[in-house]
């Protein structure tokens, strides 16, 4: 399990693991470690220079900031595709390699909103698009190497996919 280092995210991860463990009658003997990852902190995965980007977050609020980010219109920020690919690669590299593995990544609504918008090719996010409390994105990868893999995801009941390599080419 990976999590933003913010305590409420670490606590959420621990409670989700506890809830999953209690959903079965079988005794669990595993110990799932929660590894804190800076790329999952808000809006850490997308920021290059917080002194440049920070004032825009305070001025625009989360929704305005993420809309500016997905349009690559903020100073001190990574290109949206680069920022999202960094997070996706983290998820790819921390996923268990066996066929029955499942991993959990706990982050913030702003990170989730940005990822969903960018991988969906959207340039505008509305309040209705914004992730609800505890709403999650289900992702998986097909392929043995990240850059050659296909990302598949389910968001609000819709299944989508994209080639990581082709996605990265859109940055140019």
Regions found by a protein language model. Give the residues of each.
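Phosphate-coordination/substrate-recognition cap region in phosphate-metabolizing enzymes
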Residues: 1-63
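A mid-sequence, solvent-exposed acidic-amphipathic segment
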Residues: 69-103
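Flexible loop/turn segments at secondary-structure boundaries
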Residues: 9, 112-113
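Hydrophobic, Leu/Ile/Phe/Ala-enriched alpha-helical segments that form helix-helix packing faces
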Residues: 12-24, 87-95, 115, 119, ...
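Acidic, low-complexity terminal tails and accessory targeting/binding regions
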Residues: 22, 40-53, 97-101, 113-172
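Extended, charge-rich low-complexity interaction segments
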Residues: 58-82, 164-172
């Amino acid at each position: 399990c990976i999590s933003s280092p913010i305590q409420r995210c670490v606590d959420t991860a621990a409670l989700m693991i506890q809830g999953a463990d209690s959903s079965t009658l079988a005794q669990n003997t595993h110990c799932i470690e929660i590894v804190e990852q800076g790329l999952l902190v808000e809006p850490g995965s997308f920021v290059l220079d917080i002194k440049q980007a920070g004032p825009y977050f305070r001025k625009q609020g989360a929704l305005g900031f993420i809309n500016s980010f997905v349009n690559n219109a903020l100073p001190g920020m990574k290109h949206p595709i680069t920022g999202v690919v960094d997070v996706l690669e983290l998820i790819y590299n921390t996923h268990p390699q066996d066929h029955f593995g499942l991993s959990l990544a706990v982050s913030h609504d702003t990170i989730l909103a940005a990822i969903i918008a960018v991988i969906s090719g959207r340039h505008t996010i509305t309040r209705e698009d914004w992730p609800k409390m505890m709403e999650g994105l289900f992702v998986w990868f097909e392929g043995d190497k990240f850059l050659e893999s296909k990302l598949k995801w389910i968001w609000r009941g819709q299944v989508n996919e994209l080639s990581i390599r082709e996605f990265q080419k859109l940055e140019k």
